[in-house]
Curated annotation (Swiss-Prot):
Tree of life domain: Eukaryota
Covalent lipidation (S-geranylgeranyl cysteine), chain numbering: C207, C208
Lineage: Eukaryota, Metazoa, Chordata, Craniata, Vertebrata
Protein name as catalogued: Ras-related protein Rab-12
Gene (UniProt): RAB12
Enzyme Commission code: 3.6.5.2
Length: 208
């Protein structure tokens, strides 16, 4: 049967944190040891069933390099869920989180669900960021969840996406979901302005 709803999720974070690996593990159950850096925006689609509903999930994988920010910023606007990823073995990717929160504050809708993910848990012996540091950062952001994962070992990957989708469904009445998300969302051409039917940009929130 056709999907009941269509949802957009965007994955953001610094270069090399494993955004593409998380997406491909979830959608295709594959893992690439030496994935090429994403140029601009890539996407995959996966259909999931939650709460008795069939949901077509479009996942946008964004480039982490600053030179692509002008391209990727347009995709924040209609995303109902945002996954912010850092590498637990690279402190600089954790230090970049406030920068990414500024992008969220500026471009994302106010009702977007937020999830912070510490990736590469398979490299525990090389850890530079403790779980407590990740939890503390997420705790200081209103409504942000936190978890650690490993795309390589397929640990917590499904849980990341399914929990995010479940949070979106719980937050939005079904009639609103049906009205807002029934239109086709498969075009990857960003609009230069926020469409009038979308929520306003997310107001500034405390990020650190």
């Amino acid at each position: 049967r056709p999907a009941d709803f269509k949802l957009q999720v965007i994955i953001i974070g610094s270069r090399g944190v494993g955004k593409t690996s998380l997406m491909e593990r979830f959608t295709d159950d594959t893992f690439c040891e030496a994935c090429k850096s994403t140029v601009g925006v890539d996407f995959k689609i996966k259909t999931v069933e939650l709460r008795g509903k069939k949901i077509r999930l479009q996942i946008w994988d964004t480039a982490g390099q600053e030179r692509f920010n002008s391209i990727t910023s347009a995709y924040y606007r209609s995303a109902k869920g945002i996954i912010l990823v850092y590498d637990i073995t690279k402190k600089e990717t954790f230090d970049d989180l406030p920068k990414w929160m500024k992008m969220i504050d500026k471009y994302a809708s106010e009702d977007a669900e937020l999830l912070l993910v510490g990736n590469k848990l398979d490299c525990e012996t090389d850890r530079e960021i403790t779980r407590q540091q990740g939890e503390k950062f997420a705790h200081e952001i209103t409504g942000m969840r936190f978890c650690e994962a490993s795309a390589k070992d397929n640990f917590n990957v499904d849980e990341i996406f399914l929990k995010l989708v479940d949070d979106i469904l719980k937050k939005m009445p079904l009639d609103i979901l049906r009205n807002e998300l029934s239109n086709s969302i498969l075009s990857l051409q960003p609009e230069p302005e926020i469409p009038p039917e979308l929520p306003p940009p997310r107001p500034h929130v405390r990020c650190c």
